[in-house]
Amino acid sequence: GPVRVRENGESIPFYVHGRSCLTGAGDTDRTLDMLSRGENLKGMVPSSDMSKHLPAKAVRRLKRLSRMVLSLGISACAGKREGNLPRAIFFGTRWGALSETHDFLAKLFETDERLSSPTDFIGSVHNAPAGQAAIHFHAPGPNITITGCNGSFEQALFSAGLLCGEDPFLLVGADEYNEHLSPLFDPEASSAERATDGGGALYLKRKKEGAT
């Protein structure tokens, strides 16, 4: 059935035209297979699964969360032709791009707060991954990143209901694990065996025709 958002007391349906996920198990097919067998999905997303749909330039240039979000978006929109791609991006994340944040701060402290990487600075802001997805899909509409703890994905969906109009859009929720910062934000992530990250994406439209 459709994903529904309430607006002014009215239920608005969005239909799923594409989906993808990345977990410790791997890509969507591996994740669904393990779920069907009741197996645990913990662990970090394998780099091979995260990078296999990406252009080589993106693999070289992007770090973990931006790579994850772009991979999720490309997989969710697989087979879609130009003119039938998302025109808006809505991204929910709790912690944002931890790899770039750590690397920017580490280099800054190493140089007595004099120098660091402009690339890491740009990549460290929360909306950088959604920006990469918008650039890839040439999405001219709203590009919104929501940070609301465990409700980030839900809030991103609500934002889409308010802002997207009739345009198709990409809804993504993802977070990365970083060995330096994740344990500081979440004490339960302090041991390597609990290191877990991943995300999911839905390509949504108000039109039912062609929905999965």
Please state what every model-predicted region is.
Residues 157:
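Short-chain dehydrogenase/reductase
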Residues 1-142, 148-154, 162-168, 174-212:
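Conserved "HGTGT" condensation-loop signature of ketosynthase/thiolase-family condensing enzymes
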